[in-house]
Amino acid sequence: NHIIAWFGRLALAMGPLAALLVYGFWGYCYIPVFSGVLALASFVLIAMVRFPFKAPSEKMPLFSLDRFFLPQGLPLFVNLILIMMVVGVLLAQVHSVTYYAMLLSGLAMAIVAERFAFVNAELKSEVLTGIIVLAAAVLMEFTHQARALNYMQPAMIGFASGITGSRFLLFYLKLSKHCQRGTSQSSFFLAWETGISLGFLLKFGFLSSDSSRVPYACLGLLVISLGLYNFFVHPWYMKHRNR
């Protein structure tokens, strides 16, 4: 579960980076072709995986959230959406190849930090650190310094989203009951992607006319996320976890 989720996070930087490189070498018309080839390759790889057949339960409801959404993880779901909305808003702005390369380096730093810095740290330290680092990345918008916005900001976004996403996934897995690991992982990905999508919607739907409002909106979301996590979600999780 952990490894698959990390490949998804790395794709957050590698996808736009690849698109910009294709655009730079061959133009926009080749981007849909390149995307189609990647989708076809993904389909082939998934088709190569053999899943053992398992008989369904005796009572199969017509509608079921099984393998899709974990109802008892709703507080985690809402909190993660709010955090990832900030990432979505920041990524919705115009960026360069350098930006996404630094975003990838930030994700790599998060992997190293998980292995060494947070291995024996307090349980909620990763999420709190991630929110604080993400807030610092947002504050860089006020500097209007191109070097900081092209190098430091994306690295901090990658680092923050990496350590925050890892901890939320582990929370989901430890909150799940027997045979619910697949469901908890699907819920995590749904919250992750929904948050980024809503961030894009917020940027293009409500903040496109005045980009100066972007940092204020992001900081507002982060303040809500920090308060929600520290005073409600984490204590709630400690009472309801199964592992």
Predicted regions and their residues:
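Symmetry-related core transmembrane helices of the 12-TM Major Facilitator Superfamily/SLC fold
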Residues: 29-48, 213-235
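C-terminal transmembrane helical hairpin of 12-TM major facilitator-type secondary transporters
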Residues: 122-168
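Interfacial helix-cap and linker-helix signal at transmembrane-aqueous boundaries
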Residues: 18-26, 117-118, 202-211
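A late C-terminal transmembrane helix in Major Facilitator Superfamily
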Residues: 175-212
